[in-house]
From Swiss-Prot:
Source species, domain of life: Eukaryota
EC number: 1.1.1.-, 1.1.1.14, 1.1.1.9
Cofactor(s), names only, from the UniProt record: Zn(2+)
GO annotation terms (biological process): flagellated sperm motility; fructose biosynthetic process; sorbitol catabolic process
Tissue and organ expression note: Expressed in liver.
Record-given protein name: Sorbitol dehydrogenase
Topology of the protein relative to the lipid bilayer: Peripheral membrane protein
Family: Belongs to the zinc-containing alcohol dehydrogenase family.
GO molecular function terms noted in the UniProt entry: D-xylulose reductase activity; L-iditol 2-dehydrogenase (NAD+) activity; NAD binding; zinc ion binding
Keywords: Cell projection, Cilium, Flagellum, Membrane, Metal-binding, Mitochondrion, NAD, Oxidoreductase, Phosphoprotein, Zinc
SMART domains in UniProt: PKS_ER
Cofactor: record remark: Binds 1 zinc ion per subunit.
SUBUNIT field: Homotetramer.
């Protein structure tokens, strides 16, 4: 292996304690590949772990951050056949450690022992060199950039949520929240056939971005009641949406989602807030509004790559800021302040292109 000085990594040590450190370059196992990292997006979860925890997931020992990533294969394990050095790949951060009951039914995201980048105690890939399960690295076509490859991870959240919601041709869809996850749900819904999408948020600037990437209607929330929000959504669409995708985790927004959804429709909870939430459950039950949860995603990378390669979805406008790995701390400050939408960290000093 090369000298350790060459694997600069962004490591969280505890609440508020983020450091750039040199780690050794790892050696790939038989079913792994060593990757030279290229582009890694900062996710809200990375910022939360910088503050120490997300719910039951607590940072107890130093952990490398980053899980929205792409890079180039530099070395392959002895049993790897489908990849070779030089291949550009997108990384699916969740790789099951065993073929358990959830893997057998194709819902490996629910496996309790899954490895997941930058979820304690597993290290992520905000570094120069990183090894990963080769079966969860997907080759990128020449017309898909590294940054698009990194954005497959957030896009997958949208694909999985829309799939759980049953979004189909001609649907009217409400997306609550215009942050990165709200916008990938907007993109996925449109790509999957939604005819009209309304996006709600408190922030006018985020809503203008939603409009830019394809929202049919935007609704700026100030202090309306959940029922009033539902009425406004219905007014914009002409009827209630068959599908609501809730990306904020805010109690009043979940309440509005229940009131807004068409009878017999589906509400999917993507953004998560406090564990106990007060909602008009009877209102949902008596109108047969199905409430579904999502946990990350599964089986989305191949279709996301096809969507990007065929230009049926455009994620490029989501990236608003870029920083080299050496300036990762500054990048995290930018992300934390909510100044940009998606902040991208460039890990390859010899190639800082998108």
């Amino acid at each position: 292996a090369k000298p350790a000085a060459e694997n600069l990594s962004l490591v969280v040590h505890g609440p508020g304690d983020l450091r750039l450190e040199n780690y050794p370059i790892p050696e790939p196992g038989p079913n792994e590949v060593l990757l030279k990292m290229h582009s890694v997006g900062i996710c809200g979860s990375d910022v939360h772990y910088w503050q120490g925890r997300i719910g039951d997931f607590v940072v107890k020992k130093p952990m490398v951050l980053g899980h929205e990533a792409s890079g180039t294969v530099v070395k392959v394990g002895s049993l790897v056949r489908h990849l070779q050095p030089g291949d550009r790949v997108a990384i699916q951060p969740g790789a099951p450690r065993q073929t358990d009951e959830f893997c057998k039914i194709g819902r490996y995201n629910l496996s309790p022992t899954i490895f997941f980048c930058a979820t304690p105690p597993d290290d992520g890939n905000l570094c120069r060199f990183y090894k990963h399960n080769a079966n969860f690295c997907y080759k990128l076509p020449d017309n898909v950039t590294f940054e698009e490859g990194a954005l497959i991870e957030p896009l997958s959240v949208g694909i999985h949520a829309c799939r759980r919601a049953g979004v189909t041709l001609g649907n009217k869809v409400l997306v609550c929240g215009a942050g990165p996850i709200g916008l990938v749900n907007l993109l996925a819904a449109k790509a999957m056939g939604a005819a009209q999408v309304v996006v709600t948020d408190l922030s006018a600037s985020r809503l203008s971005k939603a409009k830019e990437v394809g929202a049919d209607f935007i609704l700026e929330i100030s202090n309306e009641s959940p029922e009033e929000i539902a009425k406004k959504v219905e007014g914009l669409l002409g009827s209630k949406p068959e599908v609501t995708i809730e990306c904020t985790g805010v109690e009043t927004s979940i309440q509005a989602g229940i009131y807004a959804t068409h009878s017999g429709g589906t509400l999917v909870l993507v953004g998560l807030g406090s564990e106990m939430t007060s909602v008009p459950l009877v209102h949902a039950a008596t109108r047969e509004v199905d409430i579904k949860g999502v946990f990350r995603y599964c089986n989305t990378w191949p279709m996301a790559i096809s969507m990007l390669a065929s230009k049926s979805v455009n994620v490029k406008p989501l990236v608003t800021h870029r920083f080299p790995l050496e300036k990762a701390l500054e990048a995290f400050e930018t992300s934390k302040k909510g100044l940009g939408l998606k902040v991208m960290i460039k890990c390859d000093p010899s190639d800082q292109n998108p």
